[in-house]
């Protein structure tokens, strides 16, 4: 005689209750440190270590502060910008404060690569993220990720199709100075991205990070205020519109 297996109402109740909890009130950098494992190749990973990139913590924590509507980070390549600000923010959002999010890479090829190598491996090695992924195969492909709580992650590239119609609480633009200056005749990427978060009012956040790569428009320019960047387009133009924080190293 074959026995029948039935679902447990208690188990379903516990699972549903997990996703009805309010957001975890912790600094974003602390959430990343607690929940994100950084892949080292395909099969190994290590916990995020914020002591390796201490200059990232203030920018990362500003991502959850409602008095700001954007974070602009300009810095050299290979300094942990994408890992901390992009991948880390994604992990924090999934575990601590679920909401729809759009990540925009500089090309469709880079969006696919980011999803299949960095994000897929990070999700696999981070237990709290892995258990929140939707079990349905149809809910998880290269550019679209659904989670058990109903939140959605889109990994796209600079096109008016990606920037149109949908609303997101969080939008992240990576390698911004490699974006087209005008996207499909509709404007710059940051302006288009910022419009996607307006529905969420002060809770919405737009992030742009990049190493500077645009031409200076006035070669005779001289700085007239602290931390002012040269006149140009792209990430430094956005940086000049903000409060212009800068990290200083203490020598000796």
Q: Which residue ranges define each predicted feature?
A:
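Phosphate/NTP-binding elements of NTP-utilizing enzymes
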Residues: 2-252
């Amino acid at each position: 005689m074959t026995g029948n297996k039935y679902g447990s109402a208690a188990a379903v109740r516990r699972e549903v209750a997990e996703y009805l909890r309010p957001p975890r009130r912790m600094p974003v950098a602390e959430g990343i440190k607690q929940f994100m494992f950084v892949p080292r190749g395909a099969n190994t990973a290590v916990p995020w270590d914020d002591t390796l990139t201490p200059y990232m913590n203030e920018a990362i924590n500003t991502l959850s502060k409602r008095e700001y509507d954007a974070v602009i980070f300009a810095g050299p390549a290979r300094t942990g910008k994408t890992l901390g600000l992009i991948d880390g923010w994604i992990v924090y959002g999934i575990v601590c404060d679920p909401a729809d999010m759009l990540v925009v890479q500089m090309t469709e090829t880079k969006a696919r690569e980011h999803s299949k190598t960095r994000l897929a491996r990070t999700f696999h090695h981070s237990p709290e993220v892995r258990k929140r992924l939707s079990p349905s195969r149809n809910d998880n492909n290269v550019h679209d990720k659904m989670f058990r709580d109903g939140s959605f992650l889109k990994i796209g590239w600079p096109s008016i199709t990606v920037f149109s119609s949908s609303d997101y609480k969080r939008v992240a633009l990576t390698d911004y100075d490699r974006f087209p200056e005008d996207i499909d005749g509709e404007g710059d990427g940051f302006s288009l991205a910022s419009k996607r978060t307006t529905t969420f009012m002060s809770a919405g956040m737009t992030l742009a990070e990049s190493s500077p790569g645009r031409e200076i428009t006035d070669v005779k320019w001289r700085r007239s205020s602290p931390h002012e960047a040269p006149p140009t387009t792209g990430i430094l133009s956005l940086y000049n519109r903000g409060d212009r924080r800068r990290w200083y190293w203490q020598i000796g």
